[in-house]
């Protein structure tokens, strides 16, 4: 049962994290009559602009997080970022709080160690070789064992922060320092992974719903500096590789538990599929589903967490997304060139309405459909390039 917002019978959902992905989740929640409460570390975040009400707190502060949940008494708590005091969610879930998909899933995936050990050591899934390191000495020893090239990441980071590829041991000291600067909690533990010379990487959006496990068509993407630049759907792959990918994704999602959409990241090399990472929430590369599917990843996430069925997912054909990435400093961001950006057939644009920029930030995404993937990617890139950001 779902009541009406602002009434005694309202179904209340609290978003922990109010960025561009949280904004789309909020929109889908409101389409089904849910009262939305936005929480983030800074004011006027994208989802806050459309939520029924919002709060600014440090979500890594356990006392502050507990206090805001006890104040609002939400029926659902939906983590949309990793930088949260997850132990508080675990404790409150034991007291009866409904955390999406589960507090355990949120805690396991907030750092790379928890999910990697679950995938490789508990579930026995194929992954790259890896070591976790607390000191620079351990770090150098791990590089010696794995060899170069190898990949270094803080165990807690997002959007590529602190990640680097070591192609020669002379780069080790710089990579260690960069990883220490890029972690969400400051310096700390890192993972050193063997470099898989993959043919391509995919995000397999996997939904655990009341009527079973469902998959979106695989999404291909291009990364730069650890963050996505373009994504496309469907990624061409053989039926055998797709089946292997779905089997891996199913095992991970079922092990994490709960209802919701999960972004499962996989590497493909020939006929081999390797598990990389998973997010228990909509994935940035999945922004392409805003134009490629009848139900976007956000709509699917909301259906699942509300306990509603997903009878089918229709994919419209070759589609792509390209980010609007800007570098600068401003608290008065404006946009020009929108008419040119939207002049071509089957193009759409999402501007995230982020309140400020200080450095490099993703401010929007262009979306396109076309006769084939290459054409769709080029159309999305062309559209994104025509958006002019004025400071």
UniProtKB/Swiss-Prot annotation:
InterPro entries: ATP-grasp, ATP-grasp_carboxylate-amine, ATP_grasp_subdomain_1, PreATP-grasp_dom_sf, PurT, PurT/PurK_preATP-grasp, PurT_C, Rudment_hybrid_motif
Record keywords, A-Z: ATP-binding, Ligase, Magnesium, Metal-binding, Nucleotide-binding, Purine biosynthesis
ATP-grasp domain location: 117-306
Catalytic activity: N(1)-(5-phospho-beta-D-ribosyl)glycinamide + formate + ATP = N(2)-formyl-N(1)-(5-phospho-beta-D-ribosyl)glycinamide + ADP + phosphate + H(+)
Entry EC number(s): 6.3.1.21
MF GO annotations: ATP binding; magnesium ion binding; phosphoribosylglycinamide formyltransferase 2 activity; phosphoribosylglycinamide formyltransferase activity
Source taxon at top rank: Bacteria
Chain positions recorded as Mg(2+) binding sites: 265, 277
Main EC class the enzyme belongs to: ligase
Binding residues annotated for ATP, in chain numbering: 112, 153, 158-163, 193-196, 201
GO BP: 'de novo' IMP biosynthetic process
Entry GO CC: cytosol
Binding site for N(1)-(5-phospho-beta-D-ribosyl)glycinamide: 20-21, 80, 284, 354, 361-362
Pathway: Purine metabolism; IMP biosynthesis via de novo pathway; N(2)-formyl-N(1)-(5-phospho-D-ribosyl)glycinamide from N(1)-(5-phospho-D-ribosyl)glycinamide (formate route): step 1/1
Family as reported in the entry's similarity comment: Belongs to the PurK/PurT family.
Subunit description: Homodimer.
NCBIfam families: PRK09288.1, purT
PANTHER family for the chain: FORMATE-DEPENDENT PHOSPHORIBOSYLGLYCINAMIDE FORMYLTRANSFERASE
Job of this protein: Involved in the de novo purine biosynthesis. Catalyzes the transfer of formate to 5-phospho-ribosyl-glycinamide (GAR), producing 5-phospho-ribosyl-N-formylglycinamide (FGAR). Formate is provided by PurU via hydrolysis of 10-formyl-tetrahydrofolate.
UniProt-listed HAMAP family: PurT (MF_01643)
Protein name: Formate-dependent phosphoribosylglycinamide formyltransferase
Organism of this sequence: Shewanella sp. (strain MR-7)
Lineage: Bacteria, Pseudomonadati, Pseudomonadota, Gammaproteobacteria, Alteromonadales
The gene coding this protein: purT
């Amino acid at each position: 049962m779902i009541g009406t917002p602002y009434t005694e019978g309202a179904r209340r959902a609290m978003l922990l994290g109010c960025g561009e992905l949280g904004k789309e989740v909020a929109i889908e929640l409101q389409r089904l009559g849910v009262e939305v409460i936005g929480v983030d570390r800074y004011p006027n975040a994208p989802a806050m602009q459309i939520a029924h009400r919002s709060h600014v707190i440090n979500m890594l502060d356990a006392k502050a997080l507990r206090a805001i949940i006890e104040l609002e008494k939400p029926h659902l708590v939906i983590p949309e970022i990793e930088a949260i005091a997850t132990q508080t969610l675990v404790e409150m879930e034991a007291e009866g709080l409904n955390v999406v998909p589960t507090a355990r899933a949120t805690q396991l995936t907030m750092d790379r160690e928890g999910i990697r050990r679950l995938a490789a050591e508990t579930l026995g899934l194929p992954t790259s070789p890896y070591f976790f390191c607390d000191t620079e000495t351990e770090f150098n020893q791990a590089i010696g064992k794995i060899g170069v090239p190898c990949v270094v990441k803080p165990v807690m980071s997002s959007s590529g922060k602190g990640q680097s590829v070591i192609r020669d041991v002379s780069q080790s000291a710089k990579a260690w320092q960069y990883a220490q600067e890029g972690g969400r909690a400051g310096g700390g533990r890192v993972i050193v992974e063997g470099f898989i010379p993959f043919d391509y990487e995919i995000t397999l959006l996997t939904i655990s719903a009341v009527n079973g496990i469902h998959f979106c068509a695989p999404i291909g993407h291009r990364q730069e500096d650890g963050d996505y630049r373009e994504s496309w759907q469907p990624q061409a792959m053989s039926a055998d590789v797709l089946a292997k990918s779905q089997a891996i994704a199913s095992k991970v999602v079922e092990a994490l538990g709960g209802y919701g959409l999960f972004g499962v990241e996989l590497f493909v090399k020939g006929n081999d599929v390797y598990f990389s990472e998973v997010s228990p929430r909509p994935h940035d590369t999945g922004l392409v589903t805003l134009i490629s599917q009848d139900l976007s990843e956000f709509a699917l996430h909301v259906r699942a967490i509300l306990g509603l069925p997903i009878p089918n997912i229709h994919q419209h054909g070759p589609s792509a997304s390209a980010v609007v990435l800007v570098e600068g400093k401003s608290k008065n961001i404006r946009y020009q060139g929108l008419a040119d950006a939207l002049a071509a057939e089957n193009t759409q644009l999402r501007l995230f309405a982020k309140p400020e920029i200080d450095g490099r930030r993703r401010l929007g995404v262009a979306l396109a459909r076309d006769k084939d993937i290459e054409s769709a990617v080029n159309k999305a890139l062309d559209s994104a390039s025509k958006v002019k950001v004025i400071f």
